[in-house]
């Protein structure tokens, strides 16, 4: 499966305002997935108000994760997911919905669960078939407060890079034994990679042995050997980079 990052503004530029712009972009990828039999997992990489303070979540101006402090932003996220799910409810190449990429804020275990429940409740009003995927707090890895499972078609996800859990015994006990076997739910690693080839191969084999699904991150990059695909920077692309950088 290919994990596809989404920005909420492509589907809902303002609160309670829906847009089809994002579907115009996604539909070409859906056609590609159908053509080559590649499942797609839709991933909310940037949520209203931002789910962490990193640049990839589009944290605005003050660098805060205001998804957790604004009920309006939480409703906005849930309504956006309902909009997306309603559009793709009958699309078989869509494997599931990754509700929130790498949430990160201290002391929000209860709030994070409430956000997920709002999103799932909204999705299930229009789509009872697709999987819903939830990530733990602290960039996907702390699932405190997210048990027991609260949907019959739920997947628990975590991310793994060098610098995280380094021994496979601890990882097995925390994820395979502590989540999948205890609660009878599937596991999926939504991100791993961008380290050495040897490390990547070894951890992939660990996932495969333990029936843990995975998706390499990221699938395509610019002039890097750590991605599955890489492309060269063209003169036109460099001009764009220079413009963004103010040169």
Regions found by a protein language model. Give the residues of each.
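A short, flexible beta-alpha/helix-coil linker loop
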Residues: 8-12, 102-105
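Intrinsic low-complexity, glycine/proline- and repeat-rich
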Residues: 245-247
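An active-site-proximal structural segment forming one wall of the substrate-binding cleft
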Residues: 1-2, 12-96, 115-124
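Short, solvent-exposed turn/loop segments enriched in Gly/Ser/Thr/Pro and often Arg
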Residues: 5-8, 44-52, 136-138, 218-223
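Extracellular glycoside hydrolase catalytic/binding regions
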Residues: 72-222, 226-243
């Amino acid at each position: 499966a290919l994990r596809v990052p989404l920005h909420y503004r492509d589907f809902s530029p303002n609160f309670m305002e829906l847009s089809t712009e994002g579907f115009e972009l996604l539909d070409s990828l859906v056609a590609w997935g159908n053509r080559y039999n590649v499942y797609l997992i839709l991933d909310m990489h940037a949520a209203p108000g931002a789910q962490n303070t990193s640049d990839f979540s589009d944290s605005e101006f003050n660098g805060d994760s205001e998804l957790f402090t604004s009920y309006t932003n939480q409703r906005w996220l849930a309504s956006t997911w309902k909009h997306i799910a309603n559009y793709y409810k009958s699309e078989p190449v869509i494997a599931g919905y990754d509700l929130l990429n790498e949430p990160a804020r201290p002391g929000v275990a209860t709030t994070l669960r409430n956000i997920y429940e709002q999103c799932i409740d909204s999705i299930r009003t229009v789509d009872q078939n697709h999987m819903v995927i939830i990530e733990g707090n602290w960039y996907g890895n702390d699932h405190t407060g997210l048990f027991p499972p609260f949907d019959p078609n739920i997947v628990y996800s975590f991310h793994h890079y060098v610098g995280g859990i380094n021994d496979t015994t601890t990882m097995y006990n925390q994820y395979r034994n502590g989540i999948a076997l205890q609660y009878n739910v599937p596991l999926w690693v939504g991100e791993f990679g961008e380290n050495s080839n040897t490390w990547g191969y070894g951890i992939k084999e660990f996932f495969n042995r333990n029936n843990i699904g995975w998706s390499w991150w990221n699938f395509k990059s610019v002039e890097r050997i750590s991605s599955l695909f890489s492309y060269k920077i063209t003169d036109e692309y460099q001009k764009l980079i220079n413009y963004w950088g103010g040169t």
